[in-house]
């Protein structure tokens, strides 16, 4: 039982059903498969607690949910783990999308765009712990994947981690692996294997439609989330209109207590995206009440 005495559960209702129904009234929208980019895989909280499970409900009847379960004594993945993950997807691409590939810690730092040697030394134990968190956290998806073949969500349960890894020292390396140790200062290399669900879903449909360097330049995790969402939702269109509530529920950001604060938070992220030329422009429409606010977002030609 994952709910032992030491573990605490935090539940959050994202109530996506109503926003999806609203979205599907718009007949010119293509129903795209919901993929892992759209789930709160990486927590946006900077107050993560040890042994805390997060459970996100995507329907009022609790039939559709994502549960993120840390290893015992650990915390769930957050902002650092997302940056490591994006860097690993880039290394994966450079290795021809093979599910298992080799890399060094310096490869990860290179792809995270961390160049300063002292910063690397400081971050080394944190990135190593982050890699461990990607391997040891369980993600339990219930009724969340949409099949375009069937034309409906699939009624299933998936329990998976993001990846597994093997840390290999020179004395244990085979002939192929020893070639990585040409640099004698290197202590170990990593054989990384993405789980089938993440390899199939993220790699084929998700993060690899994005430029990893562009994502990593967005320092704020909420802004990064908003960018990935609006990019996916707009598809090839140069204009997107979305309710603030809809955006907030998918990050996720708190809504019920203070919609005004959340709308202004989204607005700040959109302003940052505009300032850095990720989007062309945007307009906030309050529509009399903050609860009814929406955003119009404009993009440059692809």
Regions found by a protein language model. Name each.
Residues 1-302:
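Charged, alpha-helix-forming regions
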């Amino acid at each position: 039982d994952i709910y032992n005495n030491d573990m605490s559960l935090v539940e959050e209702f994202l109530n996506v059903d109503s926003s999806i129904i609203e979205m599907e009234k718009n007949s010119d929208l293509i129903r795209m498969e919901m993929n892992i980019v759209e789930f709160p895989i990486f927590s946006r909280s900077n107050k993560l607690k040890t042994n805390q499970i997060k459970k996100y409900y995507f329907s009022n009847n609790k039939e559709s949910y994502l549960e993120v379960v840390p290893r015992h004594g650990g915390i769930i993945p957050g902002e650092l783990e997302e940056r490591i993950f994006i860097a690993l997807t880039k290394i994966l691409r450079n290795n021809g999308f093979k599910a298992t590939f080799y890399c060094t810690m310096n490869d990860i730092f290179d792809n995270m765009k961390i160049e300063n040697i002292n910063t690397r030394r400081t971050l080394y134990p944190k990135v190593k712990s982050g890699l461990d968190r990607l391997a040891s956290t369980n993600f339990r998806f219930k009724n969340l994947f949409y099949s375009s073949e069937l034309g409906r969500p699939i009624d299933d349960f998936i329990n998976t981690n993001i990846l597994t890894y093997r840390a290999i020292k020179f004395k244990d390396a085979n002939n192929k692996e020893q070639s990585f140790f040409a640099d004698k200062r290197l202590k170990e290399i990593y054989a990384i294997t993405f789980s089938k669900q993440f390899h199939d879903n993220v790699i084929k449909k998700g993060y690899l439609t994005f430029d990893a360097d562009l994502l990593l330049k967005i320092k704020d995790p909420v802004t990064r989330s908003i960018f990935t969402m609006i990019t996916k939702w707009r598809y090839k269109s140069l204009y997107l209109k979305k309710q603030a509530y809809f955006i907030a529920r998918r990050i996720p950001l708190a809504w019920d207590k203070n919609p005004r604060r959340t709308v202004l938070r989204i607005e700040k992220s959109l302003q940052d995206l505009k300032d850095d030329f990720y989007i062309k422009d945007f307009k906030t429409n309050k529509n009399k009440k903050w609860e009814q606010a929406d955003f119009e977002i404009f993009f440059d030609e692809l």
